[in-house]
């Protein structure tokens, strides 16, 4: 199994159980999330209630909740939204922090493609939910979530160069 960690913080952000599609010249990865139900399920199907802890029918256990699989699996933490000015400041800082951690070849690809990816993201800022890894570090790579037209499941966007592949 492959896990993809935030190159800047080490937080786990994705795994190969969630297939991705490269967009914006490979700068962004697009991953489909799904709403799932999680929680304790305690089902007793025997016909003898007195032998199954309790003499009365206790009804349904309401400790289940709906979550997005990617957010739940990697314990992503939602962040406040960004306006255009704040997002551009984030991107400038992100480029400055990430570039030295990349190989020379990856630096060239990243520098060439990040402008196009930023232009792709900017007009969609109001549609995004923003997430970072579990550690909630100030220097974290942002993960973007939005709903495509007519979809009930969110789509996530990751900066491909901000991920480090780790074999488990």
UniProtKB/Swiss-Prot annotation:
<comment type="similarity">
    <text>Belongs to the TCTP family.</text>
</comment>
<dbReference type="InterPro" id="IPR011057">
    <property type="entry name" value="Mss4-like_sf"/>
</dbReference>
<dbReference type="GO" id="GO:0048768">
    <property type="term" value="P:root hair cell tip growth"/>
</dbReference>
<dbReference type="GO" id="GO:0009860">
    <property type="term" value="P:pollen tube growth"/>
</dbReference>
<dbReference type="GO" id="GO:0051301">
    <property type="term" value="P:cell division"/>
</dbReference>
<dbReference type="GO" id="GO:0009793">
    <property type="term" value="P:embryo development ending in seed dormancy"/>
</dbReference>
<dbReference type="GO" id="GO:0005886">
    <property type="term" value="C:plasma membrane"/>
</dbReference>
<dbReference type="Pfam" id="PF00838">
    <property type="entry name" value="TCTP"/>
</dbReference>
<dbReference type="GO" id="GO:0000325">
    <property type="term" value="C:plant-type vacuole"/>
</dbReference>
<keyword id="KW-0963">Cytoplasm</keyword>
<dbReference type="GO" id="GO:0008017">
    <property type="term" value="F:microtubule binding"/>
</dbReference>
<dbReference type="GO" id="GO:0040014">
    <property type="term" value="P:regulation of multicellular organism growth"/>
</dbReference>
<dbReference type="InterPro" id="IPR018105">
    <property type="entry name" value="Translational_control_tumour_p"/>
</dbReference>
<dbReference type="GO" id="GO:0005634">
    <property type="term" value="C:nucleus"/>
</dbReference>
<dbReference type="GO" id="GO:0005829">
    <property type="term" value="C:cytosol"/>
</dbReference>
<dbReference type="GO" id="GO:0031117">
    <property type="term" value="P:positive regulation of microtubule depolymerization"/>
</dbReference>
<dbReference type="GO" id="GO:0001558">
    <property type="term" value="P:regulation of cell growth"/>
</dbReference>
<dbReference type="GO" id="GO:0090333">
    <property type="term" value="P:regulation of stomatal closure"/>
</dbReference>
<dbReference type="InterPro" id="IPR011323">
    <property type="entry name" value="Mss4/transl-control_tumour"/>
</dbReference>
<dbReference type="InterPro" id="IPR018103">
    <property type="entry name" value="Translation_control_tumour_CS"/>
</dbReference>
<comment type="function">
    <text>General regulator required for the development of the entire plant. Regulates the duration of cell cycle. Probable activator of Rab GTPases and upstream regulator of the cell growth-regulating TOR (target of rapamycin) network. Might also control spatial growth in pollen tubes or root hairs via the TORC2 signaling branch. Involved in the regulation of abscisic acid- and calcium-mediated stomatal closure, but not in light or H(+)-pumping induced stomatal opening. May regulate microtubules depolymerization. Binds calcium and has a cytoprotective function.</text>
</comment>
<dbReference type="InterPro" id="IPR034737">
    <property type="entry name" value="TCTP"/>
</dbReference>
<dbReference type="GO" id="GO:0005794">
    <property type="term" value="C:Golgi apparatus"/>
</dbReference>
<protein>
    <recommendedName>
        <fullName>Translationally-controlled tumor protein 1</fullName>
    </recommendedName>
</protein>
<feature type="domain" description="TCTP">
    <location>
        <begin position="1"/>
        <end position="168"/>
    </location>
</feature>
<dbReference type="GO" id="GO:0048046">
    <property type="term" value="C:apoplast"/>
</dbReference>
<dbReference type="GO" id="GO:0090406">
    <property type="term" value="C:pollen tube"/>
</dbReference>
<dbReference type="GO" id="GO:0009506">
    <property type="term" value="C:plasmodesma"/>
</dbReference>
<dbReference type="GO" id="GO:0048364">
    <property type="term" value="P:root development"/>
</dbReference>
<dbReference type="GO" id="GO:0009819">
    <property type="term" value="P:drought recovery"/>
</dbReference>
<dbReference type="GO" id="GO:0009507">
    <property type="term" value="C:chloroplast"/>
</dbReference>
<dbReference type="GO" id="GO:0007346">
    <property type="term" value="P:regulation of mitotic cell cycle"/>
</dbReference>
<keyword id="KW-0106">Calcium</keyword>
<dbReference type="GO" id="GO:0048527">
    <property type="term" value="P:lateral root development"/>
</dbReference>
<dbReference type="GO" id="GO:0009579">
    <property type="term" value="C:thylakoid"/>
</dbReference>
<dbReference type="GO" id="GO:0009791">
    <property type="term" value="P:post-embryonic development"/>
</dbReference>
<comment type="subunit">
    <text>Homodimer. Interacts with the Rab GTPases RABA4A, RABA4B, RABF1 and RABF2B. Interacts with microtubules and heterodimers of alpha- and beta-tubulins. Cytosolic calcium positively regulates this interaction.</text>
</comment>
<dbReference type="GO" id="GO:0019904">
    <property type="term" value="F:protein domain specific binding"/>
</dbReference>
């Amino acid at each position: 199994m492959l896990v993809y960690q935030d190159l800047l913080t080490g937080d786990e952000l994705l795994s190969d159980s969630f297939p991705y599609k490269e967009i914006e010249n490979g700068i962004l990865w697009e991953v489909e999330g799904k709403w799932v139900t999680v929680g304790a399920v305690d089902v007793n199907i025997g016909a003898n209630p007195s032998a199954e802890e309790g003499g009365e029918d206790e009804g349904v256990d309401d400790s289940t909740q709906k979550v997005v699989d990617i957010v739940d699996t990697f314990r992503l933490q939602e962040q406040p939204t960004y306006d255009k000015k704040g997002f551009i400041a984030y991107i400038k800082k992100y480029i400055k922090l990430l570039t030295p951690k990349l190989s020379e070849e990856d630096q060239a690809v990243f520098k060439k493609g990040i402008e196009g990816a930023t232009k792709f993201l900017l007009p969609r800022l109001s549609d995004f939910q923003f997430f970072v890894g579990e550690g909630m570090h100030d220097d974290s790579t942002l993960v973007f979530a939005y709903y495509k037209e007519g979809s009930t499941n969110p789509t996530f966007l990751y900066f491909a160069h901000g991920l480090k592949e780790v074999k488990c």
